[in-house]
Amino acid sequence: MHTLIKGVLEEILEEEVIIEYPKDREHGHYATPIAFNLAKVFKKSPLVIAEELALKISTHEKTQGLFDSVVACKGYINFTLSLDFLERFTQKALELKEKFGSQPKSERSQKIFLEFVSANPTGPLHIGHARGAVFGDSLAKIARFLGHEVLCEYYVNDMGSQIRLLGLSVWLAYREHVLKESVTYPEVFYKGEYIIEIAKKANNDLEPSLFKENEETIIEVLSGYAKDLMLLEIKDNLDALGIHFDSYASEREVFKHKDAVFERLEKANALYEKDSKIWLKSSLYQDESDRVLIKEDKSYTYLAGDIVYHDEKFKQNYTKYINIWGADHHGYIARVKASLEFLGYDSNKLEVLLAQMVRLLKDNEPYKMSKRAGNFILIKDVIDDVGKDALRFIFLSKRLDTHLEFDVNTLKKQDSSNPIYYIHYANSRIHTMLEKSPFSKEEVLQTPLTDLNAEEKYLLFSALSLPKIIESSFEEYGLQKMCEYAKTLASEFHRFYNAGKILDTPKAKELLKICLMVSLSLSNAFKLLGIEIKTKISAKD
């Protein structure tokens, strides 16, 4: 609808037209500030230009039946859509059902490689991982809905010092809790009940002879054993959030290609030796300084592994590569992009989205840390507390790059202060009305819209605006727009519902048709957010 209006106006005016939503609904459904843009060109007041253009648009043959009114107001041109136009779009939308708002694959479709979560398999997923996980999953859903091809991948950091430290931590816990030895722990180690659980499970699962081997052998075996257990638990946690990956890439397997990658970096004159280390000349590409890839002891840095992994990704020739990282990785972006340039790739194809910190409260107090995981709040604990859908909604309700703080008790309330409940309640009200209605759904669908007042038309317009919201949410990586849209539409519906009777009016079927459109838009929006909308819900109010 938005695209059609924009196209018609640009054809008439032969200028690029920006379409906005007026802040005041009394000004219409759409507005354009084009008169301000043309004021300097024509050396006229925007007010005069707006009047001239409004007349040109309203009298043009292509807008007949499209608008009820085209009005110049303070330099803006405001448009009110005709009921006939809204009716045609409503009929088409209701026929499309769950495909309403989607786009077919086309020449504009992209092939997107989306990597997210990629948490080290050294512990359970905590709440800090959940935000990026939910965002990435919903972004993929929206991209596919818009006709793009998406591969979702989890990069498993299954080698290196952190994996050995995991094995060492389990070994020390085994000695303390199974062998009942007195153990001195190092300054840095993985702690929490989950480490003790793994140690006890290893005692049951692994051959007793293992624990008679030398310590390095024991630690190596326990590292792999614990890593596999944690990866299974991570997958279970993701499943509980409704998240499923297309592939899991092993750092250990990917890193087997390191020699070929380093050979290409050398040929590109990207490396040099200094202080017995091998450095990447990343400062040539906007990095703050050059970065070490191989340390004095000949071991590789984390960056080296990441470079090899990105080379493997870029070999697959996707249109766009999106990484979702924690905000603390901000300084890491330039060095990875530098390596891509040295390897002959276009680093502009890589977009890195940063997930800011999450702070959970309960009764206005910091949420209790998990004993099982030490100083972390586990995803599973919060899902058990408030449910998957509420957690997903709240994580998507703010821009990814802004800090998020919320009290989980809000998500348990059955009133308008709980946004997800308020939206479910709107849909529940609609389905309850349909059940009570003497009309069949087919009768309602076939009823033409001929007698709607301004408020009813605006509610219908809001429900029909979903496609543009989906599109802009994807283009701007602003998935919070989907949440805001659903909240606003639900609020508008509740206002409509509370304003007067719906079933006991001569135009009941027309009003029910609007309700069906609202329900469809709420349902499709929630589906893209990874939330199942409810058709039945109890209410205290």
Swiss-Prot record:
Documented EC number(s): 6.1.1.19
Subcellular location: Cytoplasm
Span(s) of short sequence motif 'HIGH' region: 119-129
InterPro entries xref list: aa-tRNA-synth_I_CS, Arg-tRNA-ligase, Arg-tRNA-synth_N, Arg-tRNA-synth_N_sf, ArgRS_core, DALR_anticod-bd, Rossmann-like_a/b/a_fold, tRNAsynth_Ia_anticodon-bd
Principal place of residence: cytoplasm
A Pfam cross-reference name: tRNA-synt_1d
Keyword Protein biosynthesis carried by entry: yes
Protein name: Arginine--tRNA ligase
Gene name, Swiss-Prot/TrEMBL: argS
